[in-house]
Amino acid sequence: MQADELVDGVPYQNELLKQLVWPPSYQNPIPKKKYHLVVVGAGPAGLIASISAAGLGANVALVEKAHMGGDCLNNGCVPSKALLAYTQGNKDATFKDAFSWMRKIRASIAHHDSVQRYVDAGVDVFLGE
């Protein structure tokens, strides 16, 4: 699929991002009675804390209300930097091209913040409220 191709009216790259950071079929795990660490928020700090603790053998729960990656991946740092990088020195850049580029960059790095990566690392990921 191409970056501009639509899936149910949504750009393909947005759909790919969603599949990684909030998979529609994902089921929250049955909570353990006790965790060594409960992390609230799957932004950059929460992701590092949870995967590091799990790597050291801790029972870790990661709770995210919105999307894995937090504002940095989904709304803030990554999208704004990608838009700036694309348009810098490109006087012919269009809104459509810039946003297509931003979606491509965001989707290409989302696997680092994916639910599956953290589940595979031993983190109990809880999505929603």
Question: Where are the model-predicted features located?
Answer:
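Glycine-rich flavin
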Residues: 1-35, 51-58, 63-129
